Amino acid sequence: MVTGALAVLLVLTAVWAVKLIQVARSVNANAAYWSQPRGEPGGLLYVALGDSAAQGIGASEPDKGYVGLIAQRLRDGTGRAVQVVNLSTSGARIGDVLDTQLPALGSLRQTPDIVTVAIGGNDIRAYDRATFGAATDQLTAALPRGTYVADAPYFMHGRWQRDAAQAADLLRASAVEHGLRPVPLHDALKAQGWQAMLTQFAADWFHPNDRGHRVWADAFWSRISAADDRFS
């Protein structure tokens, strides 16, 4: 019986290791996928800013991340073509959005119909309230009015979660102050409970899997569909 249990454990470990490698490899693969506009030109333009979550890391395919899911819901809700320009980068922090992604957004020839931002998760690792608050205010002041801004992700427990909860408050308040549309991502993820760790995360236990990305998309879509009847 012990030998059988050990064999099962070894198999499970091997499967986990393979999936972990797949997550790591998806960073370059997803960046290549999103390096060009995706979808159909001539209709709605959706621009995404953010970090690896916006890149779809953890999902089985790049377009099964929350950005791809939002794009599909825009198609379904409007009956129109949707083109996605995904300017996010894995590992990005708020400073990277300010330095690189916002200038790229400003250089687009077509004015976006919808812009989403999910950033701040990587800033939690070296969180300082004053620094984060200043960066958040700079970001929200520079974003187009009406941009959908997610607050910080939920980190389950410990210091990171305490910092993330505070960061979420700062993001929400700053978004409202600058005429943006805050998305309550933190509360949406928290509502999934501890079971989400087993069912909604990729093998690295950091990025959302397909199911987790659907939760992210749901949080955004609830806000989008309520705020703009063009998309519902």
Which functions belong to the PLM regions below?
Residues 22-27, 45-47, 55-134:
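Conserved SGNH/GDSL esterase-like catalytic core that processes O-acyl groups on lipids
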Residues 39, 59, 63, 77, ...:
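Alpha-helix initiation/capping motif
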Residues 51, 89, 152:
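Cofactor-binding loop segments of dinucleotide-utilizing enzymes, especially the Rossmann-like FAD-
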Residues 52-54, 209:
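Ser/Thr-glycine-rich phosphate-binding loops at phosphate-binding pockets of nucleotides
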Residues 100-232:
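Alpha-helical cap/lid subdomain in secreted, periplasmic
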